[in-house]
Amino acid sequence: MLSIIIPTKNESKLILKTLLPLQKLRKNKTCEIILVDGNSSDSNIKIAKPYVDKILISQSDRSIQQNIGASVCKNNLLLFLHADTKINLKDVENIILQNKKITWGFFKIKFDNNKKRYRFLEFFINLRSILFKYGTGDQCLFMSKEFN
């Protein structure tokens, strides 16, 4: 089982694009979705409410929001997902299947824009991540709860 933790602040224009694809996993009971909101002033919470399992309110600080979400989740495997990030469900299903073997990881980044400069940027972000075993939040970091 997987807990997907999504820190948000004023994401009402983007949040459904992130949450709707995850509903298949939620329906199959293979994940819980926790939204930790940083005191949004828009309709982010209202829009997200039907599509998440828990909504928590926190100060607006991504690391604090992620830690709060991790502290209340019920599963051992955590995935931190930015509210503006689309994720490949097949990749998520693969990490769920390998749950007991995973300590931490990240996905390769791919931008929606196909211009050369974005292809160049994603290539070097992914290369850096592979060479230095270093992922960023935009790459959907995942880890076991016990990982230090």
Predicted regions and their residues:
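Short aromatic/hydrophobic "clamp" motif used to bind/position activated sugar donors
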Residues: L78
